[in-house]
């Protein structure tokens, strides 16, 4: 059974829509980038920490961890700490292309073909999507932050929500911007014989 090491309703919706069966086991791993860490490395490390935390509790299951980071002008944006932080992030993103990076980690066991012995594997990857956001007026930012929608999202916006009106185009995987690169996850599951 695939265990999603995340309480994110968006990740759950994406897996459900793709027809991938799973159970949810949320983690309390702090999502803190390390100083000087490359954004992809940070997203991959945090995804690994989440998956490893649950894998220790459920060693016979396949565990999927993920972490999403937004990068603009070299600054990594995680989830906003408060409404003021959300407004600050939206001002940074306003009128600028930025990258959404999701690190994904799959931990489990698979049989070796020659002797059917089980071995543990860790498959860690990341996906990057470029998002183009229109320029936002202060009134747009304040009214959007007041809805509460930005508060639990990396970069303080939801492409699948009200912020979609400010995003004319993206380059890359849409589901990655929502929070989980589904095609990448499916390829990883298939590689390890666990796609069904």
Locate each region found by the language model.
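A structural micro-motif
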Residues: 20-22, 61
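A short beta-strand-loop structural module common to alpha/beta enzyme folds
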Residues: 23-31
